[in-house]
Amino acid sequence: MNLYIIIFHLANDADRRNNLVSLIKQQGSWARITDNVWCIKAENKTTAEIRDVLGPGIQIQKDERLMVVDITKSAWASYYLPKEVADWLKG
């Protein structure tokens, strides 16, 4: 199981943001870190494959940002992360 972090910045469009969040949740088990930073656990997917589902799925614009990073073997530390999110990341 791989762990990915998804970071995005969209124009102020609640419908498109909700669509992106829905697409993120469809990629695998997920946790919301902040409003614009999510983590997913998924098998048999690459960062490019995830990006290519999310970006076109919301018709991302040139002035917006979307980044997918594989953090499977990365160390992490945090302050004030909700316990359920920290537990999810550890699990």
Go through the PLM ranges and name each one.
Residues D15-A31:
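Short aromatic-glycine-(Arg/Gly/Cys) micro-motifs in beta-strand/loop hairpins
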Residues M1-N18:
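Short S/T/G/P-rich N-terminal loop/turn motif that feeds into the first structured element of a domain
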Residues Q26-Y80:
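Short, intrinsically disordered low-complexity segments
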Residues F8-N12, I24, N44:
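Generic secondary-structure microfeatures
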Residues I5, Y80-L81:
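Compositionally biased, intrinsically disordered low-complexity regions enriched in proline and serine
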Residues P82-G91:
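A mid-sequence interfacial segment
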